[in-house]
């Protein structure tokens, strides 16, 4: 019984870390899958690239779906992990991340639909065949714009997670500071020109935060005794 109780928070932390690792890896693989296929301002070249590398394009979409599914798993596991610190804030963080996941899944349609249109899967009678590449490129241009929106919700999520990590006694406070800083950076997309300008720096900070948190959860986990102490204190307050 004691061993099971001790293993539970550590197992939750490591499952969260593994899910996060899968999320980061598949998200990066999806980016590389689409790289070089979309030519800005050239619908014909974009259509040619997509049709010539249709399997690669579909693989990128599959990676996006896996990334979203693993992110939902992270959401549930983070809620359980940080619930002893503050249940309401842990729920709020989960809420923000689920909204981000929903927006991300919606944005991926702007990768799938152009492939279907160009491949003739769904012929559009109201659009001439020579206009299809331009329509496909227009739809593809909406994906990064939608991405800017779900990044904002990830920003809110990371700010709350950063605070919870900092207030916890079972994880290093430095991870909390890093997560909050990454979240505040993501919130710069509330002013799109600023977010676009800062994107290279934000991406590096965001990736550093995710990798640091992921590796810590997988390799070290949490301080089980302190987690249980916070859990008992939370139960007493309730």
Residue ranges and their predicted role:
Residues 1-238:
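Hydrophobic, aromatic-enriched alpha-helical segments typical of multi-pass transmembrane helices
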